[in-house]
Amino acid sequence: DWVTKKSQTDRHLALYLREWGRKYPNRGYGGMFLRWLLSKELSSPYNSFGNGSAMRVSPCGFYAQSLDEALFLAKQSAEVTHNHPEGIKGAQSVAAAIYLAKTGSTKAIIKEYIENNFGYDLSRTCDEIRRVYKFNETCQETCPEAIIAFLESHDYESAIRLGISLGGDSDTIGAIVGGM
């Protein structure tokens, strides 16, 4: 609802996130998000660079009518909680990949755009990542890996399987890859 109404503010989004989060409080949210969610006051963003901003951003990429709009909506979506530059960057990189895929860009174009605009190293393979990957819930250690799984995939199922097979925060990686 928030993404489709141009008159909605960051406060509306924060209230919307809290409404849904409180309706479903036992979903394995990150600790900082859960504290924000359950606080009595609608508190300020908490400077997070966790991957929650990237996990929830897919509607922004799907709804956007331009790449600039996808980036703008992703930034707005991230900033209400994950206002650290890496949290915003992670959300924007995923929304950009989704928008570019939705509009018919090749995987080579998507890879080049993400590398050039977000500085992610997408030259590794899933096999290389899998050998050394550990649990990490930051955008900078989750988003590139999810994007690589998408780039290596052949269809939706293989994307999800590749993402989850990396290990680490695999449910979040699966959610991110699934949006792409």
Predicted regions and their residues:
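Structured, active/binding-site neighborhoods that engage oxygen-rich ligands
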Residues: 1-180
